[in-house]
Regions:
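Conserved class I S-adenosyl-L-methionine
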Residues: 2-47, 62-66, 85-88, 150-176, ...
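Class I SAM-dependent methyltransferase SAM/SAH-binding core
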Residues: 54, 60-110
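A conserved beta-strand element that flanks and buttresses the S-adenosyl-L-methionine
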Residues: 121
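Short catalytic micro-motifs in class I SAM-dependent methyltransferases
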Residues: 124-125
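Short alpha-helix
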Residues: 174-189
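Core SAM-dependent methyltransferase catalytic element
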Residues: 191, 197-212
């Protein structure tokens, strides 16, 4: 991979990073995921056995078992800007026992990958990106031609935005865009939407990087 850190990183709110570092130790207790709904999302990703996957905002590793069920020769780069979240994920999925998984502490804006991945996943994290347009641009660049970018939540946009609004100043203004706005951002960055669902149960948008 040509990846690494950008020499001009996007500044991230220290308060927001501190919020997630503080919550990491109890995250799995205070954040409940319906695993059947997560499985539904994983099923839409079209994971191939040799895919190279970039997961942004891995948290404590909720998606890792769903990737491992599909991968044979592939791998996962699991990224989070919270050092404590990565530490929690490593405890659950030690790299010696999970050789297909590697962890990286980094913000999305610090990444500088170029056509390195078949699949990029933002599960339950997109509202926390300060500049969502720039995030899509960076993640689209990380994809190989034909690769997929997925933004997904196992709840409705209305519920997600409401939870954030009532969660304190650190993430109180972290909202999902409308599905139409997200589709426009995808299109502007050479991505063709191949799956979308925006209802009371899910917010999912998956797009493929076009060949030209």
């Amino acid at each position: 991979m040509k990846g690494g850190k950008n020499t001009n990183p996007k500044i991230v709110s220290p308060k927001k990073r501190a919020f997630f570092n503080e919550k990491a130790a109890i995250w799995d207790e205070i954040t409940v995921h319906n695993l059947k709904k997560v499985q539904y999302i994983a099923d839409q990703l079209g994971i191939q056995c040799d895919d190279r996957i970039l997961d942004i905002g891995i948290g404590t590793g909720i998606m890792i078992p769903f990737y491992e069920r599909c991968l044979v020769d592939g791998c996962v780069v699991a990224v989070d800007y919270s050092k404590k979240m990565i530490e929690a994920a490593r405890l659950k999925f030690p790299e010696k026992e999970h050789p297909q998984i590697s962890f990286l502490v980094s913000d999305v804006y610090n990444l500088k990958y170029d056509a390195d991945f078949d699949l990029v996943v933002c599960y339950s994290c997109f509202p926390h990106f300060v500049d969502q347009s720039l995030a899509i641009k960076i993640l689209a660049k990380a994809l190989r031609k034909g690769g997929r970018l997925a933004v997904a939540h196992s709840d409705s946009a209305k519920k997600i935005n409401g939870v954030h609004m009532n969660s304190g100043v650190e993430i109180g203004s972290d909202f999902l865009p409308s599905i139409e706005r997200l589709k426009q951002l995808m299109k502007e960055n050479g991505l063709e939407v191949i799956f979308e669902r925006d209802d009371e149960n899910y917010f999912i948008c998956i797009a493929r990087k076009m060949a030209h």
